[in-house]
């Protein structure tokens, strides 16, 4: 990043405003969340934008994760408590049937003005998945990676079957989206190579600058292996 734009998430902010630069004094939507964008000009920082979701609601926790492109013109915001059962890009934001499914919102800055560009959901949206707990965008802003640490799929590896397993709750997943000619689409559905119950794969996520490498954290994975490429199937460190 060029260091002149800063985005700060405040996931417990309470305003019911929507969009950019709405009513900051409203406090009627507890824990709806907000993001504040600051810009540095001639060595001085000033707030440039107050950003809310397009479907603000209580307990969505918009701002639970944020990421900026290198030039600061693309902003990704996670809302891990968002409740729509929509899937894919720009689905039904007004649905409220999947509590804590989660969503990601993409905003673009043009001529100093921020506007929402896309509303992003998983291809297998599920209640409680917390999609948007972690987000990362590539340097050019054309790739987006999203973690959903409480997703329940049993697949392993890349683009496996997206079916929930009652025995693999919170195994976790990550999703990669790509922008081409201004249109976003899902490129990959990622699971750990040793998917297991409660691993929280997707609890942290990071794309390299060129988007060719992705790191995914699984903070409750249970192997006692050390170093690189150790025994993934060891389950001796059980979290109780």
Feature locations, PLM:
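Conserved beta-strand/short-helix segments
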Residues: 1-237
């Amino acid at each position: 990043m060029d260091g002149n734009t800063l985005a700060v998430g405040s996931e417990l902010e309470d305003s019911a405003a929507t969009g950019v630069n709405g009513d900051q004094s409203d406090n009627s939507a507890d824990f709806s969340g907000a993001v504040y964008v600051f810009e540095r000009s001639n060595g001085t920082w000033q707030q440039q934008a107050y950003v809310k979701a397009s479907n603000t609601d209580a307990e969505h926790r918009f701002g639970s994760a944020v990421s900026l492109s290198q030039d600061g013109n693309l902003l990704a915001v996670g809302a891990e408590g968002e409740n729509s059962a929509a899937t894919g890009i720009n689905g039904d934001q007004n649905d409220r049937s999947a509590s804590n499914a989660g969503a990601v919102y993409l905003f673009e800055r043009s001529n100093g003005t921020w506007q929402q560009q896309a509303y992003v959901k998983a291809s297998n949206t599920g209640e409680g998945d917390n999609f948007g707990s972690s987000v990362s965008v590539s340097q050019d802003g054309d790739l987006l990676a999203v973690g959903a640490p409480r997703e329940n799929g049993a697949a392993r590896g890349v683009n496996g079957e997206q079916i929930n397993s009652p025995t693999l709750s919170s195994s976790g997943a990550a999703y990669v989206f790509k922008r081409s000619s201004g249109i976003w689409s899902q490129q990959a559905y990622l699971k750990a190579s040793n998917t297991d119950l409660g691993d929280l794969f997707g609890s942290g996520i990071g794309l390299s600058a060129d988007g060719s490498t992705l790191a995914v954290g699984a903070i409750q994975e249970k192997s006692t292996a050390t170093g690189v490429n150790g025994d993934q199937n060891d389950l001796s460190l059980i979290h109780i």
